[in-house]
């Protein structure tokens, strides 16, 4: 921009000077023509005056050039100032963007950490919380909780059980008081069913098919057991030391096994290893091929492992008649441990 302004001033100045010189020359010619009768002395004065006029014009031209140079310098300085201000503004904007990005990253971390703290606080039993503290700090667990946080927050598809009931199985009995472990695959995926205990449903929810078959087996296995028609809430078992653990602790609505790759298997395998190391005798009940793959985790000979088909209607013939409930009580009694009252009332 400064170059264009300078060219304009130079052209304008040159034109003005040329016009001045032409006017002076015209005056001289006119003067010479009209004063033919004037004395030679007067002509000499006019000739002597001409160099003075030219000198004045030249001086005027130099002033214009000097003014143009100063204008160029001022414009260049202004351009430099503008560039400097623009650089400062860009630097400030970059710093602002970096600070905003860092703030977002920190906020994201805080959100994840707060959720992680909440999850840990869902363990109300101190023994379990202490026993699993090493798992809480592992990368797979943090990644899993972060992923679950996004799924629960998005609300695109309901996740079961509710977040505060994921670890319900750990809060009914101390680690040292566990007597029987019944392993399920993943939670019920219907609305209002799952609440953190394998095979159990919430109060007021009718028993699902697998639980109905469990009740049928109890009717033939445990004397005096009467099958409840409308109650599938197995909390009374959990309070006596029956650890109802699903291998995968969360699921999307209407999508069984949808969270099987989240990392839950690593966590629940760690739980089963902890149980296997316990000195008190425990009965591990494995229904179906999925649960029976966990048998390799139980290396302590103090424990009893019972296996059969799954109580699902698809494999009922391999389940009915297993008598796992009476066998569990017989084992506990032989070890001097109080038996389980399997009764569930309406």
Curated annotation (Swiss-Prot):
Protein family membership: Belongs to the uracil-DNA glycosylase (UDG) superfamily. UNG family.
Biased composition (Acidic residues): 67-86
Location of region: Disordered: 1-105
Matches recorded under InterPro entries: UDG_fam1 (IPR002043), Ura-DNA_Glyclase_AS (IPR018085), Uracil-DNA_glycosylase-like (IPR005122), Uracil-DNA_glycosylase-like_sf (IPR036895)
Subcellular location as annotated: Mitochondrion; Nucleus
GO molecular function annotation: uracil DNA N-glycosylase activity
Pfam families: UDG
Compositionally biased residues, Basic and acidic residues: 20-29
Known role: Excises uracil residues from the DNA which can arise as a result of misincorporation of dUMP residues by DNA polymerase or due to deamination of cytosine.
Phylogenetic classification of the source organism: Eukaryota, Amoebozoa, Evosea, Eumycetozoa, Dictyostelia
Transmembrane spans: none
Organism, scientific name: Dictyostelium discoideum
Highest taxon, organism lineage: Eukaryota
Protein's UniProt name: Uracil-DNA glycosylase
Keywords attached to this entry: DNA damage, DNA repair, Hydrolase, Mitochondrion, Nucleus
Catalytic residues, chain numbering: 186 (proton acceptor)
Catalysed reactions, semicolon-separated: Hydrolyzes single-stranded DNA or mismatched double-stranded DNA and polynucleotides, releasing free uracil
Any GO BP: base-excision repair, AP site formation via deaminated base removal
GO cellular component terms, semicolon-separated: mitochondrion; nucleus
């Amino acid at each position: 921009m400064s170059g264009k302004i300078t060219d304009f001033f130079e052209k304008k100045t040159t034109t003005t000077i040329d016009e001045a010189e032409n006017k002076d020359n015209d005056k001289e010619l006119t003067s010479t023509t009209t004063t033919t009768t004037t004395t030679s002395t007067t002509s000499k004065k006019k000739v002597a005056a001409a160099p003075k006029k030219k000198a004045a014009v030249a001086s005027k031209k130099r002033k214009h050039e000097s003014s143009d140079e100063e204008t160029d310098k001022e414009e260049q300085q202004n351009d430099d100032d503008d560039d400097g201000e623009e650089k400062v503004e860009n630097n400030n904007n970059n710093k602002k963007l970096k600070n905003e990005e860092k703030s977002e990253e920190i906020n994201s971390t805080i959100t994840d950490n707060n959720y992680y703290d909440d999850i840990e606080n869902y363990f109300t039993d101190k023994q379990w919380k202490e026993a699993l503290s090493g798992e809480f700090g592992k990368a797979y667990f943090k990644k899993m909780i972060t992923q679950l946080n996004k799924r629960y927050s998005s609300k695109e598809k309901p996740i079961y059980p509710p977040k505060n009931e994921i670890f319900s199985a750990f809060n009914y009995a101390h680690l040292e008081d566990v007597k029987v472990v019944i392993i399920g695959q993943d939670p019920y995926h219907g609305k209002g069913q799952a609440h953190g205990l394998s095979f159990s449903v919430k109060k007021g929810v009718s028993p699902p098919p697998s639980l109905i078959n469990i009740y049928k087996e109890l009717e033939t296995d445990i004397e005096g057991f009467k099958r409840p028609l409308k109650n599938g809430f197995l909390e009374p078992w959990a309070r006596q030391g029956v650890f109802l653990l699903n291998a995968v602790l969360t699921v999307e609505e209407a999508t069984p096994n949808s969270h099987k790759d989240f990392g839950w298997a690593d966590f629940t395998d760690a739980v089963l290893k902890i149980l296997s190391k316990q000195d008190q005798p425990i009965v591990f009940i494995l229904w179906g091929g999925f649960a029976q793959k966990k048998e390799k985790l139980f290396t302590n000979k103090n424990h009893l492992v019972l296996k059969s088909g799954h109580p699902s209607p698809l494999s009922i013939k391999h389940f009915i008649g297993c008598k796992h409930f009476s066998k569990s009580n017989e084992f506990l009694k032989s070890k001097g441990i109080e038996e389980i009252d399997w009764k569930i009332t309406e």
